[in-house]
């Protein structure tokens, strides 16, 4: 029999389902031993909850498809995002639908005690895997920011897959064996089959909260704190147009390396690298222009000195081929004039003067075009040798810039996870140690649980909003577009020189000038 009414203890409309009965000799005989009534809450609640489930499943499936099908997303961070999306899919496919039915039935469990244990185990598995995946992602971002050049050597596909496997093994150990613990430590929770209550064992709640949330949360905050410090230092260097380099000092037979801040002394080496079309306030760079292939303008290092001896082959095509720039002597400020472009084929450019030695070596890159008014200036003294594979370093710097752009999106994902799950992992231990502290414990538990579940729906929305690569991938998948090759502004071998971050200054186009000031 169905009856519609209003629960006196709740504001929601409900539908009451009662078992069929028969009357014999003024005696009521129930046809089943199930609970006498199931209160179904308002249908709009069901529509809302199952819409959340559908969005969660669809969004995370889209993330998995995007990373698997788009080459530009298949990187170590992309594999971690797939692992995170799988954890969110578990929430959307198993945990959220069962919890939705539990809410719609007005907190009446319909699936039996065994499925209640499976429900809690899958919930713990997914939430633990999510935060540990985010922890690995944050450590990955920290390593990429600390050592962008050596990052690709340290973080391989095999190591990332091993880290992902470790995350899931840890999550499974914490969740499914916990069923035995729950039944042993909390047998009173299994007396009523219409209820699905989580264990109140203080030891398990404390241990699981520590491993599932607080330890990875500490590692995440530590890693992103370091990332923030590194990014702040680099952004300051970019605004100043200065890059810190390592200085090697030799005292007799012993040699030690010291890294010093360029901003602290005028006698320390300063490297400025500029490209773009914006105006430069400095008069020494105003008329400088460097053409690298077709689209990138790069103003290379400037070195002021008295004399320049170039032992190179001069051609009439006014180009510079594969320069090997080597300054062997530092010098005082003076001007260098050039009336035409020159061609150096694997030769040295020797800067001679009476100052302390300065050495700069760049391995031979591809063909470039150097305009007649371009300058190369590096302040003296600099006593170090840097041998760089410029093509490879340029590619690595392109990846680094791309990864740093992705780091912002991932930091938002981490922030959303912390905001969504912190209430649950604060409330659950409190209720285990102080049952009388909350008068409406069931309502609060429902709220904090669904706040955590909503995080699984938010992640794909964050990707589509803050990640240009994911937004493009989602658009291509949903509209059945073929992947188009993306043009990049960093295609020249010397587009990014000298590792890590550089000073970027834009300059307006100026007519060629035959002299350098």
Curated annotation (Swiss-Prot):
Instruction: Output the PANTHER family linked to this UniProt entry.
Output: ADRENERGIC RECEPTOR-RELATED G-PROTEIN COUPLED RECEPTOR, DOPAMINE RECEPTOR 2
Protein name stated in the entry: Dopamine receptor 4
What keywords would UniProt list here? Cell membrane, G-protein coupled receptor, Glycoprotein, Membrane, Receptor, Transducer, Transmembrane, Transmembrane helix
Tissue note: Expressed in pharyngeal neurons I1 and I2, neurons ASG, AVL, CAN, PQR, vulva, intestine, rectal glands and rectal epithelial glands. Also expressed in neurons in ray 8 in males.
| Family the entry assigns | Belongs to the G-protein coupled receptor 1 family.
Q: Could you tell me which Pfam families the record lists for this protein?
A: 7tm_1
This protein's GO CC annotations: dendrite; plasma membrane; postsynaptic membrane
**Organism source for this protein?**
Caenorhabditis elegans
Membrane topology note: Multi-pass membrane protein
In this entry, the parts of the chain located on the Cytoplasmic side of the membrane are 68-77, 130-159, 231-409, 464-517
Q: What is its main location?
A: membrane
- Can you provide one Gene Ontology molecular function annotated for this UniProt record? dopamine neurotransmitter receptor activity
Q: What does this protein do?
A: Receptor for dopamine. The activity of this receptor is mediated by G proteins which activate adenylyl cyclase. In terms of antagonist responses, would be classed with the D1-like dopamine receptor group.
Q: Which segments carry the region annotation Disordered?
A: 309-339
Positions on the Extracellular side per record topology: 1-46, 99-108, 181-209, 431-442
